[in-house]
A protein has these predicted regions:
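Histidine-dependent nucleotide/RNA phosphoesterase domain, centered on the 2H-phosphoesterase fold
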Residues: 1-195
Length: 195
């Protein structure tokens, strides 16, 4: 199983992002992310044995309680930069609370043998990937003509454990477990999907 943890996006945010991508998709031949797949990754875990899934869920269930917080989604940009970009992204602004959630999850998973990230936590939504050089002038002009890059907010009171599976129509993300913030995990702050 290929796993990661993340924060889901509400439908109203999906709708705003879809309106943006409907304008931009025709302007450049990129590998565009399906809006329904967009999420805020807090920790990429990688391959994990299915028979040990309950062990991981138990560890995440024991995270210390954290207060719910708000994430703002706004702005767009390029990784690593506007020259020869590889990723087109939307900005995720969760402040210290989101960074703390990510580091708390990471710390909890280290005893399971999950390596720490070597790069600084940089939350974003991957809107498109660029595998080879393509003309971007029309896309840049379309971006310049847009008036707003405010995609709304996410009232974050939970995160999920996801499985990532390749499919014929692209990658499919499935929620395996849900973990609520603001409650101690021992009081039932998580549940296994389908349990």
């Amino acid at each position: 199983m290929r796993l990661f943890t993340g924060v889901d996006l509400p439908e109203r945010v999906h709708d705003r992002l879809e309106r943006l991508l409907a304008v931009l998709r025709p302007t450049a031949h990129l590998i565009w992310s399906p809006v329904y797949n967009l999420h805020i990754t807090t920790k990429f875990i990688g391959e994990w044995p299915e028979e040990k899934l309950d062990e991981m869920v138990t560890v995440l269930r024991r995270l210390p309680a954290a207060a719910p917080f708000t994430i703002a989604l706004r702005d767009v940009g390029w990784f690593p930069g506007p020259q020869n970009p590889r990723v087109f992204w939307a900005g995720v602004h969760g402040g210290a609370a989101l960074a703390t959630l990510a580091s708390t999850i990471e710390d909890a998973l280290v005893p399971l043998g999950i390596a720490r990230e070597t790069r600084e936590f940089a939350p974003h939504l991957t809107l498109a990937r660029i595998r080879r050089p393509v003309p971007l002038q029309a896309m840049r002009q379309a971006i310049a003509n847009l008036e707003s890059f405010d995609f709304g907010t996410v009232e974050t009171d939970r995160f999920h454990l996801y499985e990532s599976r390749p499919g014929s129509a692209g990658t499919v993300y499935s929620k395996l477990a849900e973990f609520k913030l603001g409650e101690s995990s021992s009081s039932g702050s998580s549940r296994r999907k389908g349990a």
